[in-house]
């Protein structure tokens, strides 16, 4: 039932972003507003809170906001030692010379050859709502706001039907009927997709297997030792736990979504297109992982203060592209509500075990 509401809402947002139609925008706003009123009573019954009523449940002190809140500038971003802005400029503006459909995925994604010889990944707007391109942009921007460098730089990019079809790799021509059927184009023949830096040589890991999860949770449990050679990885896993709870990403542990850099030293927070659900309490999977985690990064904990509605609105607006809406107001409110929950959870651990035992990573 919850997934059905999400898919219906996403379809309205997609219609608004692609067509820019007034009726679509108004319909989307009506949907979220009516959903909030209709489910306010249900929230009490299920023990959770609805996005539209969750703000009223927060302590008054956490709602206070200065009359003119200061605009927080995003930390200067880097990714694998390279400037984010340089990588973003490249994937946003370089001409497309080739597109090859990535095999094995249940949704559409392409490897793109750019004019300067670099590569990018491209995910178009599509009928399969398990891939929502704008969510990848939101995940990257949230990652950057938190001072992380784990999500590959991602930006919205409008790509025309002609760019895709005329540059399609010969190996992908057999998939042309599927590409035509599943790619959503607006009336001008363009698709509102996301383009991302192509990370060379990424590797799969076993961190999302039952054994891998059990082992990593041991490193993040009070009283358990962290092997010296695993301390950096443990710190990154702790960051991932918080990040996935904030984005409400249930897909991380579904298999194949725990990637590392070529040398295995860096954990990459990739595949975020099925995230940012509007339930403020998050989903069962990410909530369960969070509540098993008892060691965190001090810098990330402090960076949670930046995650407010005004700042998120500003950051996402700067990354937007015309009518391309990155997150809806309900999705932004849900992120902030989850921020409050994770901060309270960590505060509770600090009260029980002390800051030196909880905020153990830089």
Named regions from a protein language model:
Residues 1-2:
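N-terminal secretory signal peptides that target proteins for export/translocation
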């Amino acid at each position: 039932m919850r997934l059905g509401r999400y898919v219906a809402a996403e379809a309205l947002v997609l219609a608004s972003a692609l067509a820019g139609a007034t009726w679509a925008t108004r319909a989307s706003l009506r949907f979220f507003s009516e959903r909030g009123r209709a489910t306010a009573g249900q929230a009490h019954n299920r023990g959770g809170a609805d996005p539209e009523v969750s703000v009223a449940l927060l302590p008054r002190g956490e709602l206070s906001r200065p009359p003119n809140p200061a605009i927080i500038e995003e930390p200067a971003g880097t990714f694998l030692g390279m400037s984010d802005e340089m990588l973003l400029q490249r994937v946003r503006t370089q001409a497309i010379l080739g597109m090859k459909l990535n095999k094995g995925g249940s949704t559409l994604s392409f490897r793109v050859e750019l004019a300067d010889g670099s590569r990018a990944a491209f995910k178009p707007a599509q009928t399969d709502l398990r891939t929502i391109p704008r969510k990848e942009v939101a995940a990257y921007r949230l990652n950057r706001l938190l001072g992380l460098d784990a999500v590959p730089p991602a930006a919205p990019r409008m790509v025309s039907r002609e760019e895709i079809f005329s540059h399609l790799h010969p190996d992908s021509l057999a998939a042309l009927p599927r590409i035509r059927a599943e790619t959503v184009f607006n009336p001008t023949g363009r698709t509102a997709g996301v383009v991302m830096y192509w990370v060379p040589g990424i590797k799969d890991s076993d961190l999302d297997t039952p054994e891998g999860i059990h082992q990593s949770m041991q490193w993040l449990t009070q009283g358990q030792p962290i092997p010296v050679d695993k301390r950096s990885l443990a710190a990154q896993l702790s960051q991932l736990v918080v990040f996935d709870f904030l984005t409400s990403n249930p897909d991380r542990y579904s298999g194949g979504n725990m990637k590392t850099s070529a040398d295995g030293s860096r954990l990459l927070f990739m595949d975020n297109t099925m995230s940012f659900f509007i339930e403020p309490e998050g989903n069962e999977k990410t909530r369960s992982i969070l509540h098993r985690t008892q060691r965190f990064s001090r810098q990330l904990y402090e960076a949670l203060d930046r995650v407010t509605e005004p700042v998120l609105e500003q950051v996402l607006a700067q990354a937007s592209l015309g009518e391309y809406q990155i997150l809806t107001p309900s999705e932004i409110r849900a992120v902030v509500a989850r921020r409050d929950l994770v901060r309270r959870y960590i505060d509770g651990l600090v009260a029980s075990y002390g800051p030196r035992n909880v905020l153990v990573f830089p």
